[in-house]
Amino acid sequence: MEIVKSKNDLFRIIDHADQKHTSKILLFMILGTIFLDAYDITILGTMTDQLTKQFHLSPTMLSVVMTSLPIGALFGAILGGSLAHKFGRKRILSVSLLILVITSLGASLAPNLFILLTCRFIMGFAIGMDSPVAFTFIAEISNKWQKGRNVNYWQVVWYVAIVVSALVVIAFFVMGTGEHLWRFAVGFGAFIALVLYILRIKYLKESPTWIINHHSLEEATEYVRNNYDVNLKLEGNGTSFSENKSSKPSTTELFKPKYLKRIVLATSISTLQGMQYYGVGLYIPIIATYIISKDKLGVLLGTAIVNIAGIIGAYVGSQLTYKVGTRCLTMIGFSLVLIAMVMTGVFYHSLPMIINTFFIALFLFGHSGGPGTQGKTIAALSFPTYLRSQATGFVESVSRTGSIIGTFVFPIILAAVGLTNTMLILAIVPLVGLIITTALRWEAVGKNVEDE
């Protein structure tokens, strides 16, 4: 029997809980939220040729279309953390899914460019709210030994979603959807969102740490007793630091000396990884036309196959998080990405297709196992519960500027200077990331931030 005298005792109990009690929630959280976000964000990357043709887009206007979602995500991320702190994680996650159902359908049926841009912007807003809350939720339902690994699983699911999105497009392509291919593919996201919304409403429970912070000690104890299958005996009046901090914290607390290095490191990694991924990884289908094939089916198959490297890298990174640490994995990842981009930029014209494809795969492997995962993980693991949603929301919102820049500049630079020079120009991003991560020494894994 566990004795509960304060909310600190409840935090200790869930921090040491058997992982089997959270596996179902993790399944819905990771395989649901992250999968859908990745699908919606990347699906248009396979359709740039059709979008350009149907809406008569210049390289700049293509950049505007592709950037509309990340811009919406920036605004959503600004609000997501605060709303999740006030109303709970589950409500925000459910509302965002409902918005994605409506806007995915709207985008797929868009009769003109204005409607498409509007729907994609609102989709981005929902994803921006959804993503930081998802990472917070995963960290809060995982025990102390598995937080890093479980949070990092999001990147595995991200690349699974990219591969699946390419296969979905191939399926619709084979069905003969013709010029409406992009509409079917975008609309399919509404179906995924609807299924997840129904499952989430039926099965998903509120974050235990949010319950502990926002409910009485008696109510929180009952929640933990029922959901973690532990025998608890309540003693004492339940006063603790947790109850005093249940009101909305100020974002300025993130910049106090204790947390400054952590928030700068997490924000820098997340912003730079967003810039390098959205500036290169999002446009793998376009890069594939240079390296793999000019044929539409060949491009889609190549996109699906090369992104398997992302799945492998993300899985390896998640398994090594506790052993190697988030910072070391980030430095390794930035190094691999830098090598891949420089080699492609310098030797693209003189190397065979298989070697050039390998370097693109190396880019995805290094990114997914390193900075692509670790920035958000550091944000989720480096702060106590009362600050966590604020931290993940702040990191997510600032990092969206990197996503916006990367998404916007690639088509323009590519049209102006070609693939090799584009890769060399963008290689400065992982170089800067490597320098910053080397300079800022903070390791989030294994730290008990609740007791600081």
Predicted segment positions?
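Transmembrane-helix signature of 12-pass secondary carriers
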Residues: 1-452
